[in-house]
Amino acid sequence: MDRDILFRGLKAPLRLTDADPVLRLLPEVAPGWPHEVRPADPALRPFYAIRGEVEASRFLCENLIEPASPRSMDAVNAACDAMAALAMALPAEDGSVICLHAAGVAMAGRLVVFPNIRRAGKSTLSAALARAGHRVFSDDVVPLSFPAVGPPLARSMGVAPRLRLPLPKTADAGFHDWVAAVAGPRNRQYAYLRLPDQPAEGETLPLGAFVILDRQEGPGPARLEAVAADQAMDVLLHQNFTRDRHSGDILDVMAVALAGVPVFRLSYSGLEAAVDCLEAAFRAWPAGTPSGPVARFRLAEFETTLPDVGEVVRQRAGGVAREIGGTLYLADPEGRGIHRMDALAAAIWELLEEPLGRQELVAVLEESFPNIAAERLAGDLAGLLARLAEAGLVGPG
């Protein structure tokens, strides 16, 4: 039987075909996002489809927002993957939202965001903070909107926190016992947590801080230190689920956000020490309330043909350049990507505000680097200009 699961506020459904075991999981996997079950409507294009296979307890799963080959999964993994697709369906219908691959935990009335870094422990640390009484907005995806005034607003999706299994060796017996007591649906890879008083879909909090996690293998104290904003930007560049948004718009709002939201690195080994460190640091926040209309994002233009670059080169009109933490970031006019410039690339970019010939650029480099052979400088410049042209940042003068 075909069923459509309609999540409140979304037009596109999750479509289930002979997938009752997955349907039974949804109230526990997404307890805070109200949804209703209806007979499938052929006129509606689903954001994700799950079909029961002949083999017992297996389901063929297909993401229809970012099409890829269907994959066979068990019921828990099918529900997990559907929640990831839900994080793409939300901004697909709301042009004011981008979704970050990150965890977000409420502390003293603001959200502390932990951008995804492989094996850094964001989900486990989020669970440890939940155990200490802090509400988890998400362990995996944080939707953000950007009001005209004040910090960005983070939004809950009402999805239950999920832990990767097995738990890390650094987790103590008390944490293991707590997880066992609150565990919901699980398989060998993941365990969802049944937690009381968690935020419902649509609940918002101002962003308080970005915290880059640095989990240590050996024992040691937890340490929180301020870092430059570009370190957060470098991480966030690769953690945006909303890939159809115009990169110039994203660069604009992130530059403003990172100018006002502090960035830290948390080095830690044990969970309890990390929780204590975060609680000590984030007891209160500076005054400031988000207000005004939220930014709306243009869509990127991926089909545009880029012009060939000849002997004379210049910046292409319509690009966006922003300095974040002392580092220059550029977005092309079509909004297809954001690019970090090193010192040399930034200097060349500034020179190309006016049309310049390649030989003129080599001459400038020869003055700046007299100990490097002209042939090498010319080769390095050619490679840099080719990369800038491929990124759509420079064009013919």
PLM region spans:
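Conserved lysine of the Walker
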Residues: K122
